[in-house]
Amino acid sequence: MRFFIANFILRRNKNMMDYESFKQKVMEEFISYMPERYSDCTIELRKVPKVNACLTGVVIIPKGKPRSYCSPTFYMERMYEQYLECDSFEQVMQNQAVYLEESIKFLPEDILKLDFDSLKEKIVFQIVNTKENQEMIRHCPHREFMDLSVVYRVIVNVDEHGVSGFLITNDIARAEDLSEDFLYRLAKKNTKKIFPFKSERIEDTMKRMMKRWGVADKDIKASFAGVDEIPMRDRVYVVSNEYEFFGANALLYSDVLKKVVKSIGTDCYILPSSVHDLVILSTETFSESSKLRTLVRDTNCEHVRLSDRLSDNIYRFSIVDGSLECVTEEAS
């Protein structure tokens, strides 16, 4: 869709560069927009696998630094979108140069030097859809988990505005002698610490959303009158974490899921509403798994951004033995 829009704009303004011409001009001229101390730097393009996508990353390498040097990455595709919107190459370059310099100033020294002895406590999980992320998986340590894959990231910063960090690639893992099993053990400990999990009734999630949208308190209260009388077995829960980022990682923690399932009192279906949260409900109250799968698939297509989609499948958690399985198309 983006490139359809790009072609439409280009046809209306023949003076604008196409993507390939824009990319070449960035490679030739971007350094000239940076302060003088960056004049001896080189600029490199790297394919950067993102969740459900792959972007062209642009990195600046100072003279004498190894290629493993960790520079902030910006993306050619996103700069080109900005160029199409403002029709000014110079403006896009100036804005990006300011952003890059500010990012470098605030990067911790252990990140810049890729000092993994001090970064070990910042390594976390990220679960992604295996089928939709073949390019990412091919280039990084990972392990399969049902229809998903576990990859590893280093978290640079996390706050209410978002998460910044980078993917641990095969190149990084080899250079630092990091085995996948070692990464898994580190991430198992760190993820729960950096992103503390939380669970709440879906009504509480909806109340907070309505409050953000400016709905009056009395109207919110009226909308959920009587919800406390809903039997435990019929209640629906949302699992995420304190920052509401990558909350679906809870799938890797049986103890987190079991706590919610026990409060419901039956086996439960787990719906991956996005990479950031899970919805948990009783298999007895909501017995038709095919309808739940359709609900997840339709919600993904119509309401969830591509980068936030986890899976069109649903999962079943056993209250008896704590096992978790992917529910197949044929399950009913």
How does the language model describe each region?
Residues 19-39, 207-248, 301-302:
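Terminal alpha-helical anchor/extension segments at protein ends
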Residues 46-238:
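Charged, alpha-helical interface segments at or near domain boundaries
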Residues 6-17, 76-82, 162-176, 241-246, ...:
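Charged, low-complexity surface segments at secondary-structure and domain boundaries
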Residues 2-52, 56-58:
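N-terminal alpha-helical "arm" segments
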Residues 26-38, 93-96, 100, 187, ...:
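Hydrophobic, Leu/Ile/Phe/Ala-enriched alpha-helical segments that form helix-helix packing faces
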Residues 34, 38, 195-199, 268-269, ...:
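Residue-level signal for secondary-structure boundary elements
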Residues 242-332:
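C-terminal structured domains
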